[in-house]
């Protein structure tokens, strides 16, 4: 077991966004977390990634209690997260954005960088090689020197994924990676996520596009009004009465 959440609760004033949710993420799997809008999915990701602290409950990663850790400490442990809204430097080139992602792994420090030490030179060579390799992996090798502002939405999403990979994560949290994308770009992102998983990286995914979820996920957790209402393989979830009610009931009441 890679990640474990136990009886997680998150309150915002009088609103209970996550209500006694427990879940496991197994090493090497693709776990999808689904549910209607407002179900608590992104808040749960924020608890895992350290952006929010749980009101109560426990989070363990690789057997260590990481409850209450800040986001930067969580990232150093090997958990990376992507967001639906990309946070890229539009006025920089693709290669520069990726280089900034890899720069966080440099070990030369301030004085080493200032004095161009041997460690700085080694870090620079490593970073340049890694950037070139990553550009090929995410399919943007022909966009290396293009400015981010000229990329399509799908290409920007792939670049964001490349930056998340630059931290050498054990687990990636994908928060609606295909939100707002056309089908062609959705298919491209689906293939990329599968390729990432095949390298041994564990995936936890929030997504509304059910065809994609059913195609990718080995297990699915379903949230509704902050509570976990179902968990199982895609076939079981597709036929679960509570899941059907959560989706169809919301539509009828809309």
Regions found by a protein language model. Give the residues of each.
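The feature captures the beta-strand-to-loop junction immediately N-terminal to the Walker
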Residues: 34-36
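Catalytic Walker B motif of ABC-type/P-loop ATPase nucleotide-binding domains
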Residues: 172-176
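Conserved ABC nucleotide-binding domain
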Residues: 67-68, 134-152
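Helix-to-loop junction immediately C-terminal to a conserved catalytic motif
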Residues: 49
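Conserved catalytic motifs of ABC-family nucleotide-binding domains
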Residues: 168
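Conserved ABC ATPase "signature" region
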Residues: 111-143, 191-194
């Amino acid at each position: 077991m890679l990640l474990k959440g136990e009886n997680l609760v998150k309150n915002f004033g009088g609103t209970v966004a996550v209500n006694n949710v427990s879940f496991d993420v197994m090493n090497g799997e693709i776990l999808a977390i689904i549910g209607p809008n407002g179900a608590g999915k992104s808040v749960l990701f924020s608890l895992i990634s350290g952006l929010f602290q749980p009101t109560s409950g426990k989070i363990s990663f690789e057997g260590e209690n990481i409850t209450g850790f800040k986001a930067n400490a969580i990232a150093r442990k090997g958990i990376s997260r992507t967001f639906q809204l990309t946070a890229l430097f539009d006025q920089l080139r693709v290669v520069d954005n990726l280089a900034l992602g890899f720069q966080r792994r440099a070990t030369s420090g301030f004085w080493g960088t200032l004095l161009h030490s041997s460690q700085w030179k080694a870090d620079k060579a490593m970073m340049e090689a890694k950037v070139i390799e990553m550009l090929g992996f995410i399919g943007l090798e022909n966009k290396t020197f293009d400015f981010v502002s000229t990329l399509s939405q799908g290409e920007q999403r792939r670049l964001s994924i490349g930056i998340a990979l630059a931290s050498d994560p054990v687990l990636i949290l994908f928060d609606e990676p295909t939100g707002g994308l056309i089908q062609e770009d959705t298919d491209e992102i689906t293939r990329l996520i599968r390729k990432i998983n095949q390298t041994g990286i564990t995936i936890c995914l929030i997504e509304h596009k059910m065809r994609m979820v059913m195609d990718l996920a080995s297990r699915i957790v379903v949230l509704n009004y902050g509570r976990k209402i179902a968990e199982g393989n895609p076939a079981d979830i597709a036929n679960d009465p509570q899941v059907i009610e959560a989706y169809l009931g919301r539509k009828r009441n809309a």
